């Protein structure tokens, strides 16, 4: 076996140091056996020293350091005398120590191991480590008094794979992380020097935090090739009535600009409700004392940034498990009281986990070391000075309420934002949350599903306790006794209460369902509206349905009479005048009121009869006025220029001469403008920042900016990806994909799926025919309402037929 290599023999329980230095003092019959209790990362290190202080065993002739991890055999002999002499070991060994009854001081000089003569009685307070590289080692050691000293390594807990390359001694780095359960057991690494070849070079720094938790693992794919798995189980109490203590080492990222990132967080005896308490057996009593510890330190590698330990590759659950056992609780408590006065609570660190730090940008205030180098100091203390930190439970973040709705900001007056509630599915905005909630019923497929589902029925809930109570109700009833059956799904229940609850689930599911009419394409989210539609349109009392508007009638004659409204047909004509009507009853009323014998006065021109002479005189004025104003675009004639102008503007032009001063909206007639201005009274106007457009409604202003001043097309069709500026344009476009017949106007961009609406559009907008004509002056109108308004204004003395 070479001098600079270790031979790993996992099946060998004991390891002996056979090689004896020339200056070593021999003791007949005595032999040192070392048992190490955690995985050790070993590499070739030159000129590194480890000093362990204040080790005074009860029996100086017997020292046992136990371990239950790996079988490592180092064939070197170490001789001992009544007083430990200096021994040379030609191997690179790092052995962290744990002190139970007393402090331990040991100095290991690499490539040789030296134990000074006065190490047992001295009280040395400083040690030095010289390590150019870094190795993470989670160690836990305890010393037992036996006659023979054996170095034993077991692999019952952690399987460690150690790869040592003798040809590349500068690649694998070493650094020791010791989890020591003794109150004052501190490996002081203030003398550790880290060689920095370039001060301006950024370094990889990380926190290592140890906390008590379940077993875990470390997987490292770096040059060291180390894999540690700690998922196997361990007996919490050993044979000698001591219980081990499990400590985890977590890695936290640090700021590379800090000089000293080492530190300690100590947690005193945990409360009963703490889940991370570890029971330690007090040697003076049989009571188990639960305690907790968290330890962190830094890993600073300035020489091997790319080849050495790559902390960014380590997952969030990475840790090293340290087992600590056989500790004197009384000595620990006494030492903790002394050490409590020495701890500076102001030097406490804050930790940032890897999952929260995407880069090495987390600042942490470090403690300046004595020699200015990065500190590898690791403390595990039982003091209560920082105990209140552990008792402060972190505040739980409140889970966002599922009933909360997201808000958005739109442009308001003078650039001030206005909060609205947008629909995240179709983009429509609402002024209040209630309107948005009502609108969301139109998107039942996108409503949030409940988190917890019952496996026995359709019950769902967002609360875990509600599901638990519901499952308990299932346990009270036997499935064999279920006799009541649900009419909708066929499930059986034992009593009516369970069936009622089950039907509420069906009702809840149906609340978000779109209700579609069976006889036409009408659909709505509310059942009441569908019932009203069925009663008014498709009821058995109204079996005769109009194909144009869907209105129902009791008799075919009523439907035939109704269809004349859509066709404009007027088959009934007055025999005394040119009056025509679509309904015979209207014609009878006309004759009775206009051509009755009870009205002796009759017009000589139109043969209309009147009961009073004044009425006849006013009527004759209509015939006397000469209509000299002829429209250039049609056959319309007006008695004055104002009427002709009004006709041309409203019929033959798209200009709107009457403009609103507030919003610049145009109208054909002054009366329409007057009605519009009344809307603006008492409302604050919102000015567009890009033009002079003003509007009282901020939603209209938002649509104006999207349609006029932006080139973006935020509303896109999911099928053909065509973009639109406004939601209503997209809605019209979606009708082309629905499979329904679309009526497209050949004169403009108007389109609709309603045949009657399309017909009204063509007649009222793009034709010169005006089917609704005045009986007195033969003036035509697009709609009957316009004709009635005309008669009330100009033929008030005659009255409506």
UniProtKB/Swiss-Prot annotation:
Q: Which GO terms describe its cellular component?
A: nucleolus; nucleoplasm; nucleus
Report the GO molecular function annotations.
Answer: DNA-binding transcription factor activity, RNA polymerase II-specific; sequence-specific DNA binding; zinc ion binding
| Transcription regulation as UniProt keyword | yes
Q: Which InterPro entries match?
A: Transcrp_activ_Zfx/Zfy-dom, Znf_C2H2_sf, Znf_C2H2_type
Gene Ontology annotations of biological process type: regulation of transcription by RNA polymerase II
Q: Which domain of life is it from?
A: Eukaryota
Q: Does the keyword Transcription apply?
A: yes
Q: Where in the cell is it found?
A: Nucleus
Residue positions where Phosphoserine is found in the record: 270
List the C2H2-type zinc finger ranges: 421-443, 452-474, 484-506, 515-538, 544-566, 572-595, 601-623, 629-652, 658-680, 686-709, 715-737, 743-766, 772-795
Give the keywords, sorted: Activator, DNA-binding, Metal-binding, Nucleus, Phosphoprotein, Repeat, Transcription, Transcription regulation, Zinc, Zinc-finger
Q: What is this protein's function? A: Probable transcriptional activator. Binds to the consensus sequence 5'-AGGCCY-3'.
The similarity comment for this entry is: Belongs to the krueppel C2H2-type zinc-finger protein family. ZFX/ZFY subfamily.
| Recorded domain comment | The binding of ZFY to DNA is mediated by the interaction of the GGCC core base pairs with zinc fingers 12 and 13.
Q: What is this protein called?
A: Zinc finger Y-chromosomal protein
What species was this sequence derived from? Pan troglodytes
Q: Which gene encodes it?
A: ZFY
């Amino acid at each position: 076996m070479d001098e600079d290599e270790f031979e790993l023999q996992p099946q060998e329980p004991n390891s002996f140091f056979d090689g004896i230095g020339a200056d070593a003092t021999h003791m007949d019959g005595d032999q040192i056996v070392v048992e190490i209790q955690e995985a050790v990362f070993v590499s070739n290190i030159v000129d590194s020293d480890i000093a362990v202080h204040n080790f005074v065993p009860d029996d100086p002739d017997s020292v046992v350091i136990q371990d239950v991890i790996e079988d490592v055999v180092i064939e070197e002999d170490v001789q001992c005398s009544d007083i430990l002499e200096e021994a040379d070991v030609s191997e690179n060994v790092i052995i962290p120590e744990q002190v139970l009854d007393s402090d331990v001081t040991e100095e290991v000089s690499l490539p040789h191991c030296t134990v000074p003569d006065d190490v047992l009685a001295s009280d040395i307070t400083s040690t030095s480590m010289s390590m150019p590289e870094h190795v993470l080692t989670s160690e836990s050691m305890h010393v037992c008094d036996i006659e023979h000293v054996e170095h034993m390594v077991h692999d019952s807990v952690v399987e460690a794979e150690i790869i040592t390359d003798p040809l590349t001694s500068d690649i694998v780095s070493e650094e020791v992380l010791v989890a020591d359960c003794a109150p004052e057991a501190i490996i002081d690494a203030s003398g550790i020097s880290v060689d920095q070849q370039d001060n301006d070079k950024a370094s990889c720094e990380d926190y290592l935090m140890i906390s008590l938790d379940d077993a875990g693992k470390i997987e490292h794919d770096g040059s060291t090739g180390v894999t540690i798995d700690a998922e196997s189980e361990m007996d919490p109490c050993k044979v000698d009535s001591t219980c081990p203590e499990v400590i985890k080492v977590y890695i936290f990222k640090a700021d590379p600009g800090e000089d000293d990132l080492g530190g300690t967080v100590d947690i005193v005896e945990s409360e009963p409700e703490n889940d991370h308490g570890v029971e330690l057996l007090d040697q003076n009593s049989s009571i188990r004392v639960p305690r907790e510890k968290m330890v962190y330190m830094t890993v600073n590698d300035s020489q091997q940034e790319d080849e050495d330990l790559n902390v960014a590759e380590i997952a969030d659950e990475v840790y090293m498990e340290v087992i600590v056992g056989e500790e004197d609780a009384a000595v620990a408590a006494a030492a903790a009281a002394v050490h409590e006065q020495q701890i500076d609570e102001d030097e406490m660190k804050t930790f940032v986990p890897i999952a929260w730090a995407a880069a090495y940008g987390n600042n942490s205030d470090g403690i300046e070391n004595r020699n200015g180098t990065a500190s590898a100091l690791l403390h595990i203390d039982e003091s209560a000075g920082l105990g209140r930190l552990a008792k402060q439970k972190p505040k739980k973040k409140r889970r966002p309420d599922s009933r909360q709705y997201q808000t958005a900001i739109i442009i308001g007056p003078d650039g001030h934002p206005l909060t609205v509630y947008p629909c995240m599915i179709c983009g429509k905005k609402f002024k209040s949350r209630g309107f948005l909630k009502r609108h969301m019923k139109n998107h039942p497929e996108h409503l949030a599903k409940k988190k917890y589902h019952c496996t026995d029925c359709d019950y769902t809930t967002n609360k875990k306790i509600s599901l638990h109570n519901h499952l308990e109700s299932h346990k009270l009833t036997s499935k064999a006794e279920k006799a009541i059956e649900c009419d909708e799904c066929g499930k059986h229940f034992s009593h009516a209460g369970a069936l009622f609850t089950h039907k509420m689930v069906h009702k809840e599911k149906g609340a978000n369902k779109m209700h579609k009419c069976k006889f036409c394409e009408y659909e709505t989210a509310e059942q009441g509206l569908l019932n009203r539609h069925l009663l008014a349109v498709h009821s058995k009392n109204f079996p005769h349905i109009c194909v144009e508007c869907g209105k129902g009638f009791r008799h075919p004659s009523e439907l035939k009479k109704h269809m004349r409204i859509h066709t404009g047909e007027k088959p009934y004509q007055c025999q005394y005048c040119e009056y025509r009507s679509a309904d015979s009853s209207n014609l009878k009323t006309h004759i009775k009121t206009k051509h009755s014998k009870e009205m002796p006065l009759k017009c000589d021109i139109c043969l209309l009869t009147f009961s009073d002479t004044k009425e006849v005189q006013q009527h004759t004025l209509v015939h006397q006025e000469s209509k000299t104003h002829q429209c250039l675009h049609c056959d319309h004639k007006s008695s004055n220029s104002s009427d002709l102008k009004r006709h041309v503007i409203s019929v033959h032009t798209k200009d709107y001469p009457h403009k609103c001063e507030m919003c610049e909206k145009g109208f054909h007639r002054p009366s329409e403008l007057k009605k519009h201005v009344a809307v603006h009274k008492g409302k604050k106007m919102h000015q567009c920042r890009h033009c002079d457009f003003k509007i009282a409604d901020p939603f209209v202003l938002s649509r104006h900016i999207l349609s006029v001043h932006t080139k973006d097309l935020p509303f896109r069709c999911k099928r053909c990806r065509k973009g639109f500026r406004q939601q209503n344009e997209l809605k019209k476009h979606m009708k082309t994909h629905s499979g329904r017949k679309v009526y497209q106007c050949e004169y403009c961009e108007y389109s609709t799926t309603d045949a009657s609406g399309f017909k009204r559009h063509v007649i009222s907008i793009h034709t010169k025919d005006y089917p609704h004509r005045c009986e007195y002056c033969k003036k035509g109108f697009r709609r009957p309402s316009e004709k009635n308004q005309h008669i009330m204004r100009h033929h008030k003395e005659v009255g409506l037929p």
